[in-house]
């Protein structure tokens, strides 16, 4: 069931926090139209198109922080429908991991050889650390659109009719930069945050409609 969105237009050993980052990355980013084609009137159609796209890959820098600590590194992400293959490398290759699978069953392997299987990732993470990360929603938030399965959302569009800020499930997502990648205008920088976590992405490259995994 699609979310009902209120749109405003405006001018102008294995470290548990790495587990948070790995699980939080089960979202996706997707293409948008050229900036000159954007408008508030075209947003509903573009929202639906973005929510339906599911074959892509990206390379990005990523940083995660809590009130006490922070982590950063690089991310290589491949999405094939509901199947994800994401690889994180920390500074100098330290603290890396790979996560792959579908939302109902995710496997995580660290650079130290540790292996984890999650059959209910969001609930298991909440039980482990007391922080509930909206994993399924992040797939859509990173793409630049509200999660169609997660109820009402409040969207703010920028002067070009692109998503600038999103509020959903007690999270705020801010899109601070867009850029053209091979003719498609995509989120370049975004921040996802709630009272417990802050996740920043700076995307360096996209490939759309690539070979399936």
What are the language-model segments listed below?
Residues 1-11:
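N-terminal secretory signal peptides that target proteins for export/translocation
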Residues 16-17:
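Short, low-complexity intrinsically disordered segments enriched in A/P/G/S/L with frequent Arg
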Residues 25-27:
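C-terminal motif of bacterial Sec signal peptides marking the signal peptidase cleavage site
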Residues 29-32:
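Bacterial signal peptide processing site
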Residues 46-68:
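A short, Trp-centered hydrophobic/proline-enriched beta-strand micro-motif
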Residues 75-78, 99-101, 176-180:
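Extended lipid/amphipathic-ligand handling interfaces
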Residues 83-132:
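An acidic-aromatic
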Residues 144-213:
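Gly/Pro-enriched, hydrophobic low-complexity segments
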């Amino acid at each position: 069931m699609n979310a009902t969105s209120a749109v405003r237009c405006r001018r102008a050993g294995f470290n548990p926090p790495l587990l948070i980052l790995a699980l939080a990355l089960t979202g996706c980013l997707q293409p948008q139209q050229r900036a000159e084609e954007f408008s508030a009137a075209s947003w509903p159609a573009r929202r639906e198109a973005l929510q339906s796209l599911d074959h892509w890959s990206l390379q990005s820098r990523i940083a995660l922080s809590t009130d006490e600590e922070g982590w950063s590194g690089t991310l290589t992400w491949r999405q094939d429908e509901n199947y994800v293959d994401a690889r994180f490398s920390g500074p100098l290759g330290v603290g890396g991991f790979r996560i792959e699978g579908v939302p109902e069953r995710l496997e995580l392997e660290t650079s130290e050889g540790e292996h984890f299987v999650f059959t209910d990732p969001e609930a298991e993470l909440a039980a482990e650390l007391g922080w509930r990360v909206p994993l399924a929603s992040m797939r859509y938030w990173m793409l630049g659109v509200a999660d169609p399965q997660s109820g009402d959302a409040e969207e703010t569009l920028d002067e070009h009719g692109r998503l600038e800020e999103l509020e959903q499930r007690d999270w705020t997502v801010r899109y601070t930069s867009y850029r053209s990648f091979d003719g498609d205008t995509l989120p370049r920088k975004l921040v996802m945050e709630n009272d417990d976590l802050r996740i920043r992405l700076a995307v360096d490259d996209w490939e759309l409609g690539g070979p399936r995994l």
